[in-house]
Amino acid sequence: MSFNLHPISYLDADTNAGRPGNDQGTGNGHGHGAGHEHGNGYRMFDSDLNLDIDGISTGSPLTSSQSTNDSPQSSFTSQSSENSPHQKGEYMKFFGEGDKDIRGSGLSEGSYDVPTMIVEDEGSVETKIAGGETTSGVDRDDGSVKPKKIYRKVKDEDMKGPFKCHWNDCAVIFDTPELLYDHLCDDHVGRKSSNNLSLTCYWDNCLVTTVKRDHITSHLRVHVPLKPFHCDVCPKSFKRPQDLKKHSKIHADDHPKKLKKAHRRQQEEHDHEREYEHEHEHEQEQYRQSHFHNPSHSQPQSQSHQFQTMQPYPFDNMLNYDINYQMYPSMQSDMAMMNDGVDRKRRFDNGNNNMVNNILNDFNFHNISAMAPDYSNKKVKVEPSYNLDMFNKLNSFDDRYISSHPHQHQAQAPPHHAHPQHQQQQYPNNVNSQNLLEAEKFFNSLSSSIDLQYQKLSTNYQYKPQPQQLYPSVPQISKTNDNGMGGHNGGVPPNFPQVNRSFNYQANHPISMEFGGVSNFQKSAKPLEEASSEDKETDDAIESLNKLSINEFKLDDVAKHKQMVDSVIAYLANMKKTIVANKEIETKSSPEDTYSASQLSEKEGLSRNLYPKIASF
């Protein structure tokens, strides 16, 4: 008995021929048609068919969601129903709850052809099979997951060979990986023009398929130990050009790793500077309170000695001005800068070649030595511009020197006979002239950049607005003056404002502004109105933005950096002179340049007889 009925047999129940069926018929569920049931079976079509598809009612088998006995005949028409399982996202049922499985019945398995229609739910990921098994990304045959391919990195021993081809059954052996790669591209991959193009990789059952020949040839580099693409900065090599391009971004200055490392280093340096400044500010405040505001009070000897060893500026020279201490703020800063400059000069002049060598190392010049001739080509040098990064970098050199030599700035000045440092300095014997020229050019450019920044900062400090007198002083006018308000006595210009004076009047008296005079364009000596809140907010915003620029740098720090760079330039110049002098000594001492006395006399005679003598008449 078979349930494989033609779908058209459900359209007209009257014309169905008698057919044996199961015990549960469909007469009650499909009663809208004109047909009748014959026993427990189904009716088949007669020879004459009269179909009216437009007149089919909603209760017909075509529109019913499922028959009352859940027979498989309704599975073909359930998709067009309003309540079909496909629209509800449910799986179709082929058997009722009370029925037994057809496969478990006594009938032969070959007499049944059960339709197994699989409908997936929209929100479901798994797939339900007729047998009840569920699979999720696994192989349905054996249930095993396809193993992930792992490619081993190429080592040095892999480059020694021999190199065997593992493409299917090919067993050709080559001496070099280049020959193996050419063999794979020409013989196994082929070309479209030769009608033998293969876009699937059969190396050890890799089975990777591409859409272009360039893609499969690029993929073959994974299997072949060939790295023809070399990095210009580091000794690494790569198989594909895109790998080299990706790697080259590591050496860029704006790489996230480099930026993060530089930011962390700057943060540590700033934290160290803050701790150092905080300690000394606290000690200086105690020292000021004890010596200036309360002169009778004296510190204990141990505390005073401890402060003298830690303070960066000697304040003992300022004790003569303790009476008018509040009246001389500029004198205090000038003396501090002067004393600090003396200490810095001692610090740099005491034969300190370690700092110069450290600066050359950190700027990737490697001691200007020929020990590593390709070292400069493998490092990316920074630009010789005095910006924020360069400011912090030079500050770190000075901080490291202070931390390693904390008491050297208190030492006395060396004697004058030891001043020429180039006579006592020892330079390396093997010097790379190319690195020497590059270093000299770099630090000269950096010195010029520091000079420009120093001039800009010094100009800002020089033209700082000074507090001036609010009201102009009115001069005493003599009674014998006939000119009254408009004249002046003794050639001295007036010090009060005059609105109607001509513009060129002040040109005859350029000193009028120096004696408290008022400009020609000032109409009154009354104070101007206070600035509005908006102007104040604008000024605060501009001031906060200026703090972010390099103008916030201290002038003494810029001078310190200038002196450091000048010391490096002097070191390089002395090294260059020493090298030239040594070469001259070597050339003079060589036997090729030695002449005998007779040869020298002959040369002198030739030089003397070069021009003819003019006889006097």
Curated annotation (Swiss-Prot):
Keywords: Activator, Cytoplasm, DNA-binding, Metal-binding, Nucleus, Repeat, Repressor, Transcription, Transcription regulation, Zinc, Zinc-finger. Activated by C-terminal proteolytic cleavage by signaling protease (probably palB/RIM13) at neutral to alkaline ambient pH. GO terms for molecular function: DNA binding; zinc ion binding. Its main location: cytoplasm. Gene3D superfamilies: Classic Zinc Finger. Residues 242-256, 265-288 have a biased composition (Basic and acidic residues). A zinc finger (C2H2-type) spans 163-188, 199-223, 229-251. Residues 63-84, 289-307, 409-426 have a biased composition (Low complexity). InterPro entries: pacC/RIM101, Znf_C2H2_sf, Znf_C2H2_type. A motif (YPX[LI] motif) lies at residues 471-474, 611-614. It is found in: Cytoplasm; Nucleus. Residues 1-91, 242-307, 405-427 are annotated as: Disordered. GO terms for cellular component: cytoplasm; nucleus. GO terms for biological process: positive regulation of transcription by RNA polymerase II. Binds to DNA. Interacts with RIM20, which binds to the two YPX[LI] motifs and is required for proteolytic processing. Belongs to the pacC/RIM101 family. Transcription factor that mediates regulation of both acid- and alkaline-expressed genes in response to ambient pH. At alkaline ambient pH, activates transcription of alkaline-expressed genes (including RIM101 itself) and represses transcription of acid-expressed genes. This is pH-response transcription factor pacC/RIM101. The gene is RIM101.
